[in-house]
A protein has these predicted regions:
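A residue-level detector for short acidic-glycine micro-motifs
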Residues: 94-96, 110, 208
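C-terminal terminal-subdomain/extension
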Residues: 1-49, 57-58, 66-69, 119-253
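Loop/turn positions that initiate beta-strands
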Residues: 71-73
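Short aromatic-glycine-enriched beta-strand elements
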Residues: 90, 103-109
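Short, conserved beta-turn/loop elements at beta-strand boundaries and strand-helix junctions
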Residues: 97-102, 114-115, 211
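Short, surface-exposed secondary-structure edge patches
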Residues: 62-67, 83, 97
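Short, charged beta-turn/beta-strand-edge "cap" motif at the junction between a beta-strand
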Residues: 77-85, 99
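Short beta-strand-centered aromatic/proline hotspots
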Residues: 87-98
């Protein structure tokens, strides 16, 4: 239960909290270490995003999103976290078997990319090597979307060229379609660059299983978004289940 403070007391508390945060960010900015200065940028981005999430909270309806199924890969904003907690925009796998469309939260396991120095045969407890499965699933989905999109762009360009020659005054009607295509192509390019990091394989961080607000979901939000229906195989999900049982229960496997 919150304290019963006056407006002036709340303002003083706010100013004290903001001053403390500003002092911390300034200390990061003034560091001679490039990596530490980078934290200032990431934290500032997160404060902006977090404020947006909080402002949107009262208007958010989980029913406006698609229904998420067990095994689906989603991209979420885990935030700016402490220590070794996973944070930032992250791919995760849904581990709930019956998440209601109206539920405001969902339970996920974060995924991370295999690094060149990673020894996938000797991972820490709570980590499961998934091989290239997430990468191949994402590449297949992107390729599936890219082909019809490129055809749409080709057909649209022909129509634009024909209209420009005969009725240049009607060119404005293509504006939205052109903007949509440009946005979708840019998104696909970014996704390709992003998932290339997972070429060496992916690891499920079962030890960092977490329940998040669906406000944090970046993609997919609808059945037509890039990540919709990209799933892990039942074999990989069974391995994640076994690790959850081993790590968080007294059941013998």
């Amino acid at each position: 239960m919150g304290r019963n403070l006056t407006k002036e007391e709340l303002k003083r508390h706010k100013e004290k909290a903001l001053a403390k945060m500003e002092h911390y960010i300034d200390s990061l900015i003034n560091s001679p270490v490039s990596k530490t200065r980078g934290k200032a940028d990431k934290l500032s981005y997160w404060l902006e995003d977090w404020s947006t999430f909080l402002d949107f909270e009262s208007r958010f309806s989980p029913s406006s999103l698609r229904r998420y199924k067990r095994g689906e890969i989603i991209k979420v904003h885990l935030g700016y976290n402490i220590g070794s907690e996973e944070g930032g925009l992250h791919y995760c796998v849904v581990v709930e078997k019956n998440n209601s469309k109206s539920s405001p939260v969902i339970t996920v396991v974060p995924l991370t990319s295999v690094k060149k120095k990673s020894d996938v045969d000797h991972l820490h407890k709570g980590c499961i090597y998934l091989g290239n499965e997430p990468y191949t699933g994402l590449v297949s989905k992107i390729t599936y979307i890219q082909r019809p999109l490129e055809k749409k762009v080709f057909d649209l360009k022909k129509e634009v060229d024909a209209t420009y020659k005969t009725h240049p005054e009607d060119m404005h009607k293509f504006q939205k379609d052109l903007e949509d295509c440009a946005r979708d192509l840019l998104l696909l390019k970014r996704m390709r660059n992003e998932i290339n990091k997972a070429k060496l394989g992916s690891i499920a961080l079962v030890g960092q299983i977490t329940t998040i607000s669906k406000i944090r979901i970046y993609d997919p939000k609808t059945n037509f978004d890039i990540l919709s229906n990209v799933k892990l195989s039942n074999e990989k999900l069974d391995r994640i289940d076994q690790e959850i049982i081993s790590n968080f229960t007294n059941r013998k496997i």
